[in-house]
Amino acid sequence: MKKGKSKQNILIASPVRQTAPVLREFLESLCVLERTTVRTDYLFVDDNEETASSDMLRDFVTENEGTIITVDAVLNEDEDHQKGSYTKDEGGHYWQDEQVWRVAGLKNQILKYVCEHRYDAVFLIDSDLVLHPRTLEQLVSTEKEIVSNIFWTRWQPGAREMPQVWLQDEYQLYRRGVKVAEGTEADNQTIQTEVFLQQLHHPGCYEVGGLGACTLIRRNVLEAGVTFDQIPNVSFWGEDRHFCIRAQALGFSLFVDTHHPAYHIYRLSELPGVCRL
């Protein structure tokens, strides 16, 4: 009798510093993820400032046989630098460089855990996302080494929703030097940007130049040396950009899957939108 294909072992992981109402929606969406072809474990780095959030995370891993790592266990911090400076309000999220690279350190510990425990891949997710139940199965089905699930964000109130993926540099939604129509370079950039954004609204799997926040990463990528460490001669802001540059330099392509967009609770006023999913 022919044996069925063995299930892949995926670690679902996140460094968590989140308000309790948002965290509740995130965790509930993890519970309903389909797992037809995969087995999953949970790993969270508890970086919460709210006791209610830490308690909620602890209850979740108890019920779902997950693991929590405390920040103290993975970072050497003195009291003056503990937690770092990060705030958010209805206007947006505000990061200082020290906090960005602190989070990079937490993510690197997750990657190390994946390699040490021989998982096939890690699904690294930000804790303010609400996932469609098919998300993980869809990402695995692409068979890509690095693939993000699309989500959209209004970075400023009332602004246009924008994706968490891009094509070049820090957040360029066009490819410099590519001519798609007659006219100026600026005209071509505008047209390319619109074409790219429209593409992301159609179900598919597309190659991109940068991604983050909701990403399936295969273990062989990590074993090749891809991390969130800062690249000293690159000034781009954000650990995801340094991850992507390092991945591309080591020969790994980056993809985004747009079949099941996640919902981003970027501000508390967007919390009611979860009910409309």
Residue ranges and their predicted role:
Residues 8-14, 30, 40-45:
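Hydrophobic targeting segments
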Residues 19-33, 55-56:
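Short, well-formed alpha-helical segments that are part of the catalytic scaffolds
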Residues 28-39, 49, 63:
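Short, acidic, metal-binding catalytic loop of nucleotide-sugar glycosyltransferases
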Residues 39-49, 71-78:
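Short beta-strand/loop segment that forms part of the nucleotide-sugar
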Residues 56-119:
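Active-site-proximal specificity loops/subdomain of glycosyltransferases
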Residues 111, 132-231:
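Conserved catalytic core of nucleotide-sugar-dependent glycosyltransferases
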Residues 118-130:
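Short beta-strand-to-loop acidic/aromatic patch adjacent to the donor-nucleotide binding site
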Residues 197-277:
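C-terminal catalytic/acceptor-binding lobe
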